[in-house]
């Protein structure tokens, strides 16, 4: 028996994550400085850890309700209403998931029938196309352009809509570009979506990390969008809780009823200790969020200025903790540039093409690292591009 003949062809055809493939190669080198991982360099705040320790000591280690702790679902809904002014029923419109990635996955499986099309922004997070494909949907790529600050425009959106379009999977603040969508931008795009009766799956995991001086605007705040949107959030980025694997989804009850089924059969419930920690995170972390956001903003400003001084075009990101410089002037592909950085400078960043074809000519650099690491990394980039310019 050939085991490869026993496997699902659709899964076999999926390509591994471009990020993981690149870092597997980079890991072969010693003394690497990495700006590649999208993970906060802060420890989970102590008061959050204490709540999990307390739950463990008290023996609260059993399954929760499939949809999640009632207390946590209530806090998610309170948090969302406080941030966006939109109400959800914690008993029928909220599910606690194993990270935001599970929420994306079950959203696609709930919505899609074979042949349904889902619009996906490119560059975009690496799991979106596989999530659509595994749910028997058809990914349709919406290129995001540097001249539009990597935002969706109504014109570009109209160009990719077909009679088969079922949904759009949006991610703002955006990974990998750091782009944000303001209220006017969203209103214009949502008019197109409403006119074509398209569902929105909005991954807003980085919603607490914006640097415009104004709060993040959610899709669900736009008139008429609350009841055609699955809103996805989580704890990994804003609360420095990546390893706790905790996220959530909010959606109208008819959609959520079906999401509960998949979550129940595939997961049972999110990790119990993580859920108790999540309750404390939502109640008591405002100062922690502000502190981390201010630190990221300092690093963001440093990188923007440094790239400008180096003569490398770099649109200014106002969200998440990534910067997306344009290195096309050097005549190397994104992957060639990134690989030579590893080989010659012992610096690991992510080639833009890991996030789709529209990432060609760009690099994704995470500033979820210390300012000292960022300075070291930019010194190495400066040394490298000086060599490239001298080669010409």
Predicted feature residues:
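Phosphate/diphosphate ligand-binding glycine-rich loop within oxidoreductases
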Residues: 53-57, 61-66
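Conserved N-terminal alpha-helix of the aminotransferase class I/II PLP-enzyme fold
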Residues: 63-98
């Amino acid at each position: 028996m050939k085991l490869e003949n026993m496997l699902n062809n659709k899964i076999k055809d999926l390509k591994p994550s471009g990020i993981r493939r690149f870092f597997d190669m980079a890991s072969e080198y010693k003394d690497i400085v990495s700006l590649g991982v999208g993970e906060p360099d802060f420890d989970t705040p102590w008061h959050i850890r204490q709540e999990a320790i307390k739950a463990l000591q008290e023996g609260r280690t059993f399954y929760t309700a499939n949809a999640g702790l009632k207390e946590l679902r209530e806090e998610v809904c309170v948090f969302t209403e406080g941030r966006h002014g939109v109400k959800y029923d914690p008993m029928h419109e909220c599910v606690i998931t194993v990270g935001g990635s599970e929420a994306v996955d079950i959203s696609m499986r709930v919505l899609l029938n074979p042949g349904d099309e889902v619009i996906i922004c490119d560059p975009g997070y690496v799991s979106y196309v596989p999530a659509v494909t595994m749910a028997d949907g058809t990914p349709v790529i919406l290129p995001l352009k540097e001249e539009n600050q990597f935002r969706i425009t109504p014109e570009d959106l109209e160009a990719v809509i077909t009679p088969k379009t079922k949904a759009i999977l949006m991610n703002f603040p955006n990974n990998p570009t750091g782009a944000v969508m303001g209220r006017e931008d969203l209103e214009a795009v949502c008019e197109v979506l409403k006119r074509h009766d398209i569902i929105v799956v909005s991954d807003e995991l980085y919603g607490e990390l914006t640097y415009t001086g104004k709060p993040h605007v959610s899709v669900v705040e736009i008139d008429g969008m609350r009841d055609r949107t699955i809103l996805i959030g989580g704890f990994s980025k804003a609360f420095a809780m990546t390893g706790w694997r905790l996220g959530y989804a909010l959606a109208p009850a008819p959609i959520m009823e079906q999401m509960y089924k998949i979550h129940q059969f595939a997961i049972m419930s999110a990790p119990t200790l993580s859920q108790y920690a999540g309750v404390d995170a939502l109640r008591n972390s405002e100062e922690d969020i502000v502190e981390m956001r201010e630190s990221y903003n300092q690093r963001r400003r440093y990188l923007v200025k440094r790239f400008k001084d180096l003569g490398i075009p770099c649109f200014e990101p106002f969200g998440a903790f990534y910067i997306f410089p344009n290195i096309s002037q050097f005549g190397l592909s994104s992957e060639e540039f990134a690989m030579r950085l590893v080989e010659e400078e012992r610096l690991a960043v992510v080639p833009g093409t890991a996030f789709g074809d529209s990432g060609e000519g760009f690099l994704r650099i995470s500033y979820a690292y210390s300012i000292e690491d960022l300075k070291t990394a930019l010194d190495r980039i400066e040394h490298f591009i000086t060599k490239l310019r001298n080669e010409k």
